[in-house]
UniProtKB/Swiss-Prot annotation:
Biological source species: Macrovipera lebetinus (Levantine viper)
Cofactor note (record): Binds 1 zinc ion per subunit.
GO CC terms: extracellular region; plasma membrane
SMART domains: ACR, DISIN
Record: residues binding Ca(2+) 2: V408, N411, F413, E415, E418, D421
Entry's EC annotation: 3.4.24.-
Active-site residues, as the UniProt record annotates them: E339
Protein name: Zinc metalloproteinase-disintegrin-like VLAIP-B
Coiled-coil features, chain-numbered ranges: none
Cystine pairings recorded for this chain: C313-C393, C353-C377, C355-C360, C409-C438, C420-C433, C422-C428, C432-C455, C446-C452, C451-C477, C464-C484, C471-C503, C496-C508, C515-C565, C530-C576, C543-C553, C560-C602, C596-C607
GO annotation terms (biological process): apoptotic process; proteolysis
Length: 614
């Protein structure tokens, strides 16, 4: 049954009829005018840099519903990576890439004083703009356009009049990564490697691409588009902190000359094209873990976005597409968090899934009463995905030099001048770290890390990442660091599985295992004659796609296209079985690096000599 992400028509509900005002979010009734008073609030250990325009920590006092509140804000120091870049294109098609200074930015996370469940995502670039949760309710704040005034409007989310529009939905219809063996709720049955992986912080290095329609939608203003993207990613950070995942914006690319792929009203075709472009082009220019296309196009039907499920870190499939469907960036950020959630193994919430709010991030319906929370179902699906797949790219911890803005003790990032950072003294759970100074306690060599045990480095030679099969190697602690060295594996092209295959990036891809993964333990590889269907160049058989056109396999490449299996389970008589679902046509293709002949492997849809491939 199709599962959809609906964007409901949110009707305004007013406790009383007040005057109306037009704000960036739209026409708003029942708003409150406030005058925030700023009070500098540097955390312990932080030193205000005289050249800074925006403080590392600030707090504001104002009233909500006539009652005073104090908003505590800390700069989102993990928002940008050290090598953050921005790319756009000149009218004559030249690519312009710059590395703008982002140390002194104006994007903050925060909380309301004396409200333990409060959250906030605020930009302080020109007044206060953003949203905060207070006593379980979501409020928006933005400056009023009154010259020489500090007046701001505060209003509840539901008090924005929405244009009447058809509901939207996410194009994802099912998960595709499920393993044969369910993961039990208890961690007692997990391997040491799995336990370590689950406990580790995760970092998603993100690229956001804005298409040509976005460029025109925002009056061809690069700065306006950048600001909108910054606001979205700042909110993404708040959302994913609840899963111990940190989002770092690596690059923004704006297709200001024209789209570099065929962006169409078909969400599926656009997602597929974007994934191909990422693998073919973007990854060769910019190191990153995940890319999201922000588009101004209206997709066919009610679709508002789409993402591949459980494919984080995979070159073509670690992508999502999101329609810029609302003036309210919080709604767009929630939709992007939803599609990235699919990349991280989460499906749509069922009716019995709960998060303690009216709506959850992976809910099939994106309601007016949006929240930052993932449901219990989403958390378990995400955990199961991490245990089964253990995607490695999101373990890359930013180096101290990756965070170039002035250090702030208590933001969970170890920055220049710090030895550890376990959060605020109230939240720190690391007995090796002094939360007040972000220095290790006397006698401690380390605070956390796979190669840290009871505040000491594990001895050299201790296995910190066991080998996962014959194409992998065990990685060992050095005795000089708390971190496990970079994952190493056997050289690509080394024979494996008794010469049934060749090692490829730490795995031994062979067709038989791929058939079992798709059809179950009784499946085997089909006869060679079945693979001749790959010469047809349609969805039943092809080798690769170029601009959404399926390219037929050459006779010598037929075993590098669609995988043909023999399903021996009862009731199946087709000797040439394929795995095909319209929502993910690429699922069921022969994996890269698979043996296609003696001394031959599949590479980009071709059967090539193993010595040439690697």
């Amino acid at each position: 049954m199709m599962q959809v992400l609906l964007v409901t028509i949110c009707l305004a509900v007013f406790p009383y009829q007040g005057s109306s005002i037009i704000l960036e979010s739209g026409n708003v009734n029942d708003y409150e005018v406030v005058y925030p008073q700023k009070i500098t609030a540097l955390p312990k250990g932080a030193i205000q840099q005289p050249e800074q325009k925006y403080e590392d920590a600030i707090k504001y006092e104002f009233k909500v519903n006539g009652k005073p509140v104090v908003l505590h804000l800390e700069k989102n120091k993990g928002l940008f990576s050290e090598d953050y870049s921005e790319t756009h294109y000149t009218p004559d098609g030249r690519e312009i890439t710059i590395n703008p200074p982002v140390e002194d930015h104006c994007y903050y996370h925060g909380r309301i004083q004396n409200d333990a469940d409060s959250t906030a995502s605020i930009s302080a670039c020109n007044g206060l703009k953003g949203h905060f949760k207070l006593q379980g309710e979501m409020y928006l704040i933005e400056p009023l356009r009154i010259p020489d005034s500090e007046a701001h409007a505060i209003y509840k989310y539901e008090n924005i009049e929405k244009e009447d529009e058809a509901p939207k939905m996410c194009g994802v219809t099912q998960t595709n990564w499920e393993s044969d063996e369910p993961i039990k709720a208890s961690q007692l049955n997990l391997t040491p490697e799995q336990r370590t992986y689950l406990k580790s912080k995760k970092y998603v290095e993100l690229v956001i691409v804005a298409d040509y329609i976005m460029f025109w939608k925002y009056d061809r203003s690069l700065s306006t588009i950048r600001t909108r993207i910054y606001e979205i990613v700042n909110t993404l950070n708040v959302i994913y902190r609840f899963l111990n995942i940190y989002i770092a914006l690596v690059a923004v690319e704006i297709w200001s000359k024209g789209d570099l792929i065929n962006v169409t009203s078909s969400a599926y075709d656009t997602l597929d094209s974007f994934g191909e472009w990422r693998e073919r082009d973007l990854l060769n220019r910019k190191r990153h873990d995940n890319a999201q296309l922000l588009t101004g196009i209206n997709f066919n039907g009610p679709s508002a976005g789409r993402g591949f499920v459980g494919r984080m870190c995979q070159p073509k499939y670690s992508v999502g597409i999101v329609q810029d469907h609302s003036k309210i960036y919080l709604l767009v950020a929630s939709a992007m968090a939803h599609e990235m959630g699919h990349n991280l193994g989460m499906d749509h919430d069922r009716i019995d899934c709960t998060c303690g709010a009216k709506s959850c991030i992976m809910s099939g319906i994106l309601r007016c009463e949006t929240s930052y929370l993932f449901s219990d179902c989403s958390r378990e699906e995400h955990r199961k995905y991490l245990i089964n797949k253990m995607p490695q790219c999101i373990l890359n911890k930013p180096l101290k030099t990756d965070i170039v803005s002035p250090a702030v003790c208590g933001n969970y990032f170890v920055e220049v001048g710090e030895e550890c950072d376990c959060g605020s003294p109230a939240n720190c759970q690391d007995r090796c770290c002094d939360a007040a100074t972000c220095k290790l306690r006397p006698g401690a060599q380390c605070g956390d890390g796979v190669c840290c045990y009871q505040c000491k480095f594990r001895r050299a030679g201790t296995v910190c990442r066991p080998a996962n099969g014959e194409c992998d190697v065990s990685d060992l602690c050095t005795g000089q660091s708390a971190e496990c060295p970079t994952d190493q594996f056997q050289r690509n092209g080394q024979p494996c599985q008794n010469n049934k295959g060749y090692c490829y990036n730490g795995t031994c891809p062979i067709m038989e295992k791929q058939c079992i993964s798709l059809f179950g333990a009784s499946a085997t590889v089909a006869q060679d004659s079945c693979f001749q269907f790959n010469r047809r160049g349609n969805h039943y058989g092809y080798c690769r796609k170029e601009n959404n056109t399926k390219i037929a396999c050459a006779p010598e490449d037929v075993k590098c296209g669609r995988l043909y299996c023999l399903d021996n389970s009862s009731g199946h008589k087709n000797p040439c079985q394929i795995y095909y679902i319209p929502s993910d046509e690429n699922k069921g293709m022969v994996d890269p690096g698979t043996k296609c002949g003696d001394g031959m492997v599949c590479s980009n849809g071709k059967c090539v000599d193993v010595t040439i491939a690697y």
